[in-house]
Amino acid sequence: MIEIIQEYWKSLLWTDGYRFTGVAITLWLLISSVVMGGLLAVILAVGRVSSNKFIRFPIWLFTYIFRGTPLYVQLLVFYSGMYTLEIVKGTDLLNAFFRSGLNCTVLALTLNTCAYTTEIFAGAIRSVPHGEIEAARAYGFSSFKMYRCIILPSALRIALPAYSNEVILMLHSTALAFTATVPDLLKIARDINSATYQPFTAFGIAAVLYLLISYVLISLFRRAERRWLQHVSSK
């Protein structure tokens, strides 16, 4: 084990000398997909609870598709399937985008977490106390101001425990990136196993690194919950 760590620690953590690899790529996949998916989910969640069915139905359909199909299949569709379409081949921008395994992986992860996060946020919006909404209306708040100042801040706090679980699940989901030849942590562990024929050591090291990242994320979310949900836990 010591020999493997000494030889491959840079590849496992951040680079193989030619490109970013290992933990660095895993964190990039996680952060980029969670940030983009989360921002998009806030907008979609507002539409998800809309009384207008022409707004609500397309968003429901989007979340149904991406929550109802395996992420692995979604990644294969983007990485292996999209590039076979004539419209993609004939468009320089799309052609360049879908030829990149990293781009396809980020896209699949972003849309997948967006679908789950949309439902989490929509449920939290429905859970905002009705009294807060009535008070905002009594003060003459517009719908936009009411969402910005009252509903969304309360909903995001309510959603925090469920959202923390989604982020941890997304960390685990980044392990599928090797399918698109992205040199994430699991891909480097597989390469180490191929070079050394020591699967227990190679994948064991990867498991420890995933556990460490999970521990840091859980600690950060627990601290956030203690800060922003203190009024809930004290009741």
UniProtKB/Swiss-Prot annotation:
Residues 48-58, 126-157, 221-235 are cytoplasmic. It is a multi-pass membrane protein. GO terms for molecular function: transmembrane transporter activity. Residues 1-26, 80-104, 179-199 are periplasmic. Belongs to the binding-protein-dependent transport system permease family. HisMQ subfamily. One of its GO terms (biological process) is amino acid transport. It comes from Salmonella typhimurium (strain LT2 / SGSC1412 / ATCC 700720). This is Histidine/lysine/arginine/ornithine transport system permease protein HisM. Pfam families: BPD_transp_1. The gene is hisM. Residues 23-221 form the ABC transmembrane type-1 domain. The chain crosses the membrane at residues 27-47, 59-79, 105-125, 158-178, 200-220. PANTHER family: ABC TRANSPORTER PERMEASE, HISTIDINE TRANSPORT SYSTEM PERMEASE PROTEIN HISM. It comes from the Bacteria. Part of the ABC transporter complex HisPMQJ involved in histidine transport. Is also part of the ABC transporter complex HisPMQ-ArgT involved in lysine/arginine/ornithine transport. Probably responsible for the translocation of the substrate across the membrane. Required to relay the ATPase-inducing signal from the solute-binding protein to HisP. The HisPMQJ complex is composed of two ATP-binding proteins (HisP), two transmembrane proteins (HisM and HisQ) and a solute-binding protein (HisJ). The HisPMQ-ArgT complex is composed of two ATP-binding proteins (HisP), two transmembrane proteins (HisM and HisQ) and a solute-binding protein (ArgT). GO terms for cellular component: ATP-binding cassette (ABC) transporter complex; plasma membrane. It is found in: Cell inner membrane. Its main location: membrane. InterPro entries: AA_ABC_Transporter_Permease (IPR051322), AA_ABC_transptr_permease_3TM (IPR010065), MetI-like (IPR000515), MetI-like_sf (IPR035906). Keywords: Amino-acid transport, Cell inner membrane, Cell membrane, Membrane, Transmembrane, Transmembrane helix, Transport.
